[in-house]
Amino acid sequence: MFNRIISLFLLLFTGQVIALDLELTQGINSALPIAINSFGSNAAAQEIGNVIENDLTISGQFKIISGPQGANSQSSVSTLRQLGADSVVTGRVNQVGNRIEVSFTLADAVANGNILLTKTFQINANQVRALAHHISDEVYQKLTGERGIFSTRIAYISVQRNGGRSRYSLEVADADGHNPQSLLVSSEPIMSPSWSPNGKSISYVSFEKKKAEIFTVSVETGQRRLITSFPGINGAPAWSPDGQHLAVVLSKSGTPKIYDVDLSSGSMKQLTFGNSIDTEPRYSPDGRSLLFTSGRGGSPQVYRLSLADGQISRVTFEGNYNARASYTPDMKHIVMLHREDRQFNIGVQNTGGGPISNLTFSGLDESPSVSPNSRLVLYATRYQDRGVLGIVSIDGRIRMRLPAREGDVQEPAWSPYLS
């Protein structure tokens, strides 16, 4: 897939995952030490504890402190404090009729076990993982002051090959890779998934009719809507922050250019002009500009288009290939695909300019997508000759690999916060 994407870009310029496994490959010393006490011995209790521990580890902001006793036993806050925990999560799971009651407390181990948070929920059996992610969000926000991202979702393309045939599917899963759902399945390529700002729809490119077309699909119902189906390229859809427009790439007039599609009226407006190829648009979070990739300077570089006056300015100058750029939601950084010495890695640059810093180093990385809290970057890479997903923190100090158990996983997209 990596070679196919690069080959496609050069051509333009010359004429089911069951779950994802976490592997922490690099960490930091400033993580907050926290202990997750057992929620009980039954399956639901163990699953909740495991999910919370995994979530907080993925965030890169916490160091998990293990208790001295067995996995099904609870330790006192004072004991866990002696082992190094600053905070302790303790929970209980009970069956109440055909419902499950889950209670948890978050205690400050430094302040003699002072209770910071306590809540009780009643759920159905199929809501166990969702509640565990919600508890993780509550704990994360209480201790960091920031909203948690554990109840968000990810979309990606899964490719399964059998002999000479390929099966493409657009998958949506929890942020930790569990609970995957196939929104679409096709024998032809599916590309470029992008979440709507409200998290209810995904835009994508389909080749199901042996040509490129842009669709949106409802995550809840699977209902689709055809957006563009012009001769030639229909690609790289990106939502405006208000969800009312899509920026797309069309070659209907010759050279690929960026257009704005009004989703209410269907009207279109051309945004870029000239003889160079313009592609991969991404709106800024404030809706005032677009980042896009263009060869107008002689090599693929990132440019910024002001939507107020149409002025275009070059953003990247380092290296001879920078592409797939997007702002972090807080607009402090720009994340991109950066080539250096024939190695394709994920790079980051301050929004105001300056050098590009590599966040990854495998040389086979692509498709960066930033978490809604701006702290993590999800991306596609290769590991043991397979397409897998990786996560790296925006400062590069946390790196994780999420290997798929079957098929190739590619082109990830992180959802916004979900209500």
From Swiss-Prot:
Signal peptide start-end: 1-19
A matching Pfam family: PD40
Any Gene Ontology CC annotation: periplasmic space
Keywords: Cell cycle, Cell division, Periplasm, Signal
InterPro entries: 6-blade_b-propeller_TolB-like, PD40, Tol-Pal_TolB, TolB_N
Subcellular localization(s) per the UniProt record: Periplasm
Major localization class: periplasm
Annotated GO biological process: cell division; protein import
Domain of life: Bacteria
Membership in a protein family: Belongs to the TolB family.
Subunit structure: The Tol-Pal system is composed of five core proteins: the inner membrane proteins TolA, TolQ and TolR, the periplasmic protein TolB and the outer membrane protein Pal. They form a network linking the inner and outer membranes and the peptidoglycan layer.
Role according to the record: Part of the Tol-Pal system, which plays a role in outer membrane invagination during cell division and is important for maintaining outer membrane integrity.
Name of this chain's protein: Tol-Pal system protein TolB
Organism field: Legionella pneumophila subsp. pneumophila (strain Philadelphia 1 / ATCC 33152 / DSM 7513)
Upper lineage: Bacteria, Pseudomonadati, Pseudomonadota, Gammaproteobacteria, Legionellales
